[in-house]
């Protein structure tokens, strides 16, 4: 697998551009962490690296690495246009959540259009105290516009951001909004998923023969019954690499919106913090190797924690049951998140970023 270039020593917070493997990438870094973003493809995060350990926490799909921006010139069926570019990493799903949908006449693929359109990127602040970058993606088939402001302070292992979703149409419209970070690499080996969720729900199975857990089950996190045996599976444990274990669950009833992948042997983890009133669900997909056939071919060792406005259901069902966010014409939604490395198992990240000192822009 072709790796991204190694980090260079950083004297402080900074943003810089990198040309790599035909891609134009944006690096945001400080003394503790490095983020690599791909603005031309949904502002995807390709790398989130702890510089002290050298560990990159984001999963790389070996079938689609280096990343590719466009679907293959081949027949398409069964979400193949998405899987042609599914490199792993971290992307946003808007406005239809996971499932393909007819969005008021606009055909949208798996995970929506904002994860595939080109975004603009501007460094609005860079100093010894902090670097601030603003990225904006505009829908082509839908009237949604998402603006993301990332802030990284000096000597902190955490990045914080605000997201502003604007409905550019005059119409009241529904939206299912999901963040999709996929974790992989050495940090998830022998790791556990730690979260404040009280409740676990297994989704209805569109292909019951592939579901390892009992579909449509609701119970206390982290246990869910296996479909074949009824034995309770601890869904907080990341499946061992190469094993056939795989499951999809969504979590809810969060007193505080937070979760982490924690590796006790390394004394290191990666945490997320979000507004639990805005994202009341978090989906988690965990796999030791994934399906042995298309689209993963047994090469996927990953675990995800995906804050979401909605449960894992087709978009038309979400709308019919009012499990979406509604936005008036010309109005917007705003939320904030934080993500970064932790050295305590139950460390909860500070959601609010402290204001940066006045600086000159670059």
Report residues per predicted region.
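Surface-exposed acidic/polar loop and edge beta-strand patches at domain peripheries
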Residues: 2-160, 171-174, 178-362
């Amino acid at each position: 697998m072709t790796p991204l270039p190694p980090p260079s020593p950083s004297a402080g917070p900074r943003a810089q551009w990198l040309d790599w493997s035909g891609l134009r990438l944006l690096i945001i870094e400080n003394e503790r962490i490095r983020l690599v973003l791909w603005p031309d493809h949904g502002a995807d995060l390709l790398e989130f690296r702890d510089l002290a350990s050298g560990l990159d926490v984001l999963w790389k799909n070996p079938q689609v690495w280096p990343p590719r921006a466009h679907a293959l010139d081949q027949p398409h069926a069964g979400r193949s246009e998405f899987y042609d570019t599914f490199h792993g990493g971290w992307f946003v799903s808007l406005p239809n959540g996971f499932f393909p949908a007819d969005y008021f006449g606009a055909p949208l693929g798996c995970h929506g259009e904002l994860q595939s359109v080109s975004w603009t990127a501007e460094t609005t602040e860079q100093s010894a105290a902090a670097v601030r970058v603003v990225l904006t993606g505009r829908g082509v088939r839908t009237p949604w516009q998402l603006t993301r402001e990332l802030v990284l302070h000096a000597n902190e292992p955490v990045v914080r951001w605000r997201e502003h979703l604007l409905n550019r149409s005059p119409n009241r419209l529904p939206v299912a909004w999901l963040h999709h970070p996929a974790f992989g690499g050495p940090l998830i080996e022998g790791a556990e998923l730690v979260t404040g969720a009280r409740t676990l729900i297994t989704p209805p199975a569109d292909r019951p023969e592939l579901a390892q857990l009992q579909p449509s089950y609701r119970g206390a996190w982290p246990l869910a019954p296996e479909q074949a045996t009824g034995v309770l599976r601890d869904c907080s444990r990341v499946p061992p690499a190469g094993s056939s274990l795989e499951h999809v669950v969504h979590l809810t009833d969060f007193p505080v919106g937070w979760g982490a992948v924690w590796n006790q042997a390394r004394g290191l983890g990666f945490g997320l913090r979000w507004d639990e009133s805005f994202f009341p669900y978090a989906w988690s997909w965990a796999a030791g190797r994934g399906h042995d056939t298309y689209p993963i071919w047994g090469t996927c060792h990953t675990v995800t924690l995906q804050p979401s406005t909605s449960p894992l259901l087709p978009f038309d069902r979400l709308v019919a049951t009012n499990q979406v966010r509604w936005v008036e014409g010309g109005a917007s939604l705003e939320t904030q998140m934080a993500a970064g490395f932790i050295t305590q198992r139950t460390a909860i990240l500070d959601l609010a970023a402290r204001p940066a000192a006045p600086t000159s822009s670059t």
